[in-house]
């Protein structure tokens, strides 16, 4: 189950993702929480996290924080996108300023998508 957080406003996108994490942890405090950033994400760590089940709570909460900032971790997420979608764990992918081609791939697999775009500045012309 994938929740995708993206948009051109990186600050608002990050804030929305961490609000979602806080709400989910408040709702189910016994669920385990794993967070990976682009530098700590490896294939073994990702596959282990997707297969993890808690002792008292079946689902884990996993946040993959800006995986596309490092080419290898971004490729890893795209390579295992089907497994990420099919896991019983809840996976949030926080990807501010995501390229349009990647947005389409991720949105197709995501259960819910949160977009936080920067407001356009109005230019006054004469």
Predicted regions and their residues:
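Conserved beta/loop motifs at nucleotide-recognition and modification sites
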Residues: 1-126
